[in-house]
């Protein structure tokens, strides 16, 4: 709702991607298993047993902790068109080849072929797209 008030003309809108939840200066790799001096991905579980992907950026010694579910707005075409963004972004960070192809195919179906898609077969979030920010 805030997006429609602010306007999205000339802006880019993320319609798919895992968002960073936190950037941490305390190295998860170093704290848990010792520093490997190599950038890569780790998995961290919270108290509810949700798995978070953590990218450790070894050269600068920080971590990016990603949300457990990606933001997916691909099926919100009408609302997106009303906002009139200049560009749409699909941000791939944690995906394997199969998921990347799946999301590109969904984008093509909805935005290029004008098709409707059914329910998505994986966990996702809308972020603040429907709720707004309070």
Report the location of each language-model feature.
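Active-site pocket-lining/capping segments in soluble small-molecule metabolic enzymes
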Residues: 1-134
């Amino acid at each position: 709702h805030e997006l429609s008030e602010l306007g999205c003309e000339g802006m880019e809108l993320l319609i798919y991607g895992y968002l960073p939840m936190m950037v941490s200066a305390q190295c998860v790799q170093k704290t848990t298993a010792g520093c490997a001096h190599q950038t890569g991905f780790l998995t961290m579980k919270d108290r509810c047993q949700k798995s978070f992907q953590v990218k450790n950026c070894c050269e600068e010694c920080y971590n990016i902790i990603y949300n457990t579910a990606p933001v997916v707005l691909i099926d919100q075409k009408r609302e997106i068109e009303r906002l009139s963004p200049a560009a749409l972004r699909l941000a791939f960070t944690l995906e394997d080849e199969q998921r990347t192809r799946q999301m590109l195919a969904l984008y093509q179906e909805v935005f290029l072929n004008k098709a409707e898609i059914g329910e998505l077969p994986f966990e996702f979030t809308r972020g603040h797209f429907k709720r707004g920010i309070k």
